[in-house]
Design a protein with these regions (language model features):
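Intrinsically disordered, low-complexity, mixed-charge
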Residues: 1-89
């Protein structure tokens, strides 16, 4: 299992991005969380096998219909075994 911290930039707050990414993560069985940041970005913590993470990262660029993603930055992170689902914070 791998873990990454992701920051998504663009017109992504107030358009259902976190709910959309949760639905996508749940379908792929990705564990982690999503939260709005004060700078208008959305922060994600994702953990799953690397192929699944890469699939979800591709989806991060799409977002829901009303979103407009400008950038997706990733950073490797430590797996957190206590996270057993995907939550919106």
């Amino acid at each position: 299992m791998n873990a990454i911290h992701v920051t998504v930039y663009g017109q992504i707050q107030g358009v259902g991005y976190r709910s959309w990414i949760k639905d996508s993560a749940d379908k792929l069985n990705v564990k982690g969380w999503a939260r709005n940041a004060s700078d208008g970005s959305v922060e994600l913590f994702l953990q799953a096998d690397i192929d699944i993470l890469n699939n979800l990262l591709s989806l991060c660029w799409e977002g829901p219909n009303l979103s407009d993603v400008d950038d997706v930055l990733t950073q490797e992170s430590q797996v957190n075994e206590s996270i057993i689902s995907f939550e919106i914070h």
